[in-house]
């Protein structure tokens, strides 16, 4: 892991010491080298217990897939943003690349931190570079409003989390996760106090995911962010919330199991259903994809709150699968936007007549998003649905309805973008380049590997 930290840190400064002709290419190559080291270092570390790197850092089966996902998608996002950053000056492009690598370093620190104060610092350090991505390289003037929403919601959840961490230290005299899991000091407090304490812990994570009701910042941020920002935000940054939720839920296992699970799981599955219905009524392609992320992450939260092995396994699988598919959807949306300069679904249609091979990528991505067998999305959703139904059989109708509406809007995305006649007022459509096909293949290839060997994502 020290190699990953060192390479990510050096990559932040690398663009500034290379000539104007080579800095972008070398940065992308360096990103793929980081990916190679991540795959190599983490290959033998899929243990049910922590693999300690040091006293404050370690990886296990929950953090390792998310680290690999982060290092896999960073070079892809850099490749996808080449066209959108071409109009900017070389120094602006260097700043863009450095910002991306700073986010990667913060993600690696967050997913490998064993100590909660270090986890909090790394978790919050993703805020500023993400805000810079949205407000500096966004296309429309509304990006500033999106940035305000993003920072307001995130900071509103950060303060309760900080208070909870400080309180935990005063009680346990340690913030190292393995020692907290084994500690019995928490049992001396009343159930009401512990319930409030746990709410303070998880509110930052459900805002970061986000689940329905705490999601207003996400569609604005996705719509206004540049392509790299949308891909990283949907694929990785939202998973910070799920990861933190899984970690803190294990600390307060007995509290959440006895007192808080019922309202939280009910709220999450209703949120998944409502956002799936909202997606059907969307007219903006990027907003539709953003709302679909809210629905999927609401299901992830429901799976974690069941506190069952099936639920947590399903949540992990769905987070990884959603990370790849949501990034692919934003990449496809950007390919269309670069050719017709609009995200409106009423205008973005008929592309199968112009770019038939692109339609193949659309159908693969959409059917994977809806959970067609044997895709990892199906595995994750089935595990979550099974755990939720086992928790309460009356939740069957709600959670299955959410998946049905999810399938409907996924098919609507494909139908609206590829069917009907191509708009006559749009001309000079550029063919899909080889680099764009490679980008889309790099999203689908890991899913194929997971289909072949799904056990790599299972924690137990």
Swiss-Prot record:
InterPro entries per record: NADH4_N (IPR000260), NADH_Q_OxRdtase_chainM/4 (IPR010227), NADH_UbQ_OxRdtase (IPR003918), ND/Mrp_TM (IPR001750)
GO biological process: ATP synthesis coupled electron transport; electron transport coupled proton transport
GO CC annotations on file: mitochondrial membrane
Principal subcellular localisation of the protein: mitochondrion
One annotated GO molecular function: NADH dehydrogenase (ubiquinone) activity
Transmembrane segments: 26-46, 62-82, 100-120, 146-166, 194-214, 225-245, 260-280, 300-320, 353-373, 393-413, 438-458
Function per UniProt: Core subunit of the mitochondrial membrane respiratory chain NADH dehydrogenase (Complex I) that is believed to belong to the minimal assembly required for catalysis. Complex I functions in the transfer of electrons from NADH to the respiratory chain. The immediate electron acceptor for the enzyme is believed to be ubiquinone.
Family matches, as PANTHER family: NADH-UBIQUINONE OXIDOREDUCTASE CHAIN 4
Protein name: NADH-ubiquinone oxidoreductase chain 4
Species this chain originates from: Pisaster ochraceus (Ochre sea star)
Lineage start: Eukaryota, Metazoa, Echinodermata, Eleutherozoa, Asterozoa
């Amino acid at each position: 892991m020290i190699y990953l930290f060192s390479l990510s840190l050096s990559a932040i400064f690398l663009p500034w010491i290379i000539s104007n002709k080579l800095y972008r290419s070398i940065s992308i190559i360096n990103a793929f080298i980081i990916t190679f080291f991540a795959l190599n270092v983490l290959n033998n570390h899929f243990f049910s217990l922590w693999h300690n790197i040091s006293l404050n850092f370690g990886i296990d089966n929950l953090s390792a897939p998310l680290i690999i996902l982060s290092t896999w998608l960073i070079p892809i996002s850099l490749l996808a943003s080449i066209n959108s950053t071409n109009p900017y000056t070389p120094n602006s492009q260097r700043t863009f690349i450095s910002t991306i690598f700073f986010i990667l370093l913060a993600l690696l620190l967050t997913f490998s931190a064993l100590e909660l104060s270090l986890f909090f610092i790394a978790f919050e350090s993703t805020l500023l570079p993400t805000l810079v991505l949205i407000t500096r390289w966004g296309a429309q003037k509304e990006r500033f409003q999106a940035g305000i929403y993003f920072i307001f919601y995130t900071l509103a959840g950060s303060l309760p989390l900080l208070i909870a961490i400080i309180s935990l230290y005063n009680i346990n005299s340690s913030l190292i996760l393995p020692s907290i899991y084994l500690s019995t000091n928490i049992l001396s407090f009343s159930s009401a106090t512990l319930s409030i304490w746990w709410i303070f812990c998880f509110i930052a994570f459900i805002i970061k995911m986000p689940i329905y009701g705490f999601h207003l910042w996400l569609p604005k941020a996705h719509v206004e962010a540049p392509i790299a920002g949308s891909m990283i935000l949907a694929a990785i940054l939202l998973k910070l919330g799920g990861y933190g939720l899984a970690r803190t839920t294990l600390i307060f296992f007995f509290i959440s199991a006895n007192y808080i699970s019922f309202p939280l799981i009910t709220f999450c599955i209703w949120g998944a259903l409502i956002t799936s219905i909202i997606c059907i009524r969307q007219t903006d392609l990027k907003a539709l994809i953003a709302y679909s992320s809210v629905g999927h992450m609401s299901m992830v939260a429901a799976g974690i709150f069941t506190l069952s092995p099936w639920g947590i396994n399903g949540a992990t699988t769905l987070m990884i699968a959603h990370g790849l598919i949501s990034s692919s959807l934003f990449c496809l949306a950007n390919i269309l936007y670069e050719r017709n300069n609009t995200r409106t679904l009423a205008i973005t249609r008929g592309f199968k007549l112009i770019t038939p091979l692109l339609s193949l990528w659309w159908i693969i991505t959409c059917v994977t998003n809806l959970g067609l067998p044997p895709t990892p999305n199906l595995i994750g959703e089935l595990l979550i649905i099974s755990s939720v139904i086992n928790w309460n059989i009356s939740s069957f109708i709600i959670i299955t309805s959410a998946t049905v509406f999810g399938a409907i809007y996924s098919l609507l995305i494909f139908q609206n973008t590829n069917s009907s006649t191509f708009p006559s007022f749009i001309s000079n459509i550029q063919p899909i380049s080889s680099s764009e096909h490679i980008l889309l293949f790099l999203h689908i290839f890991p899913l194929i590997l997971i289909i072949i060997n799904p056990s790599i994502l299972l924690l137990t």
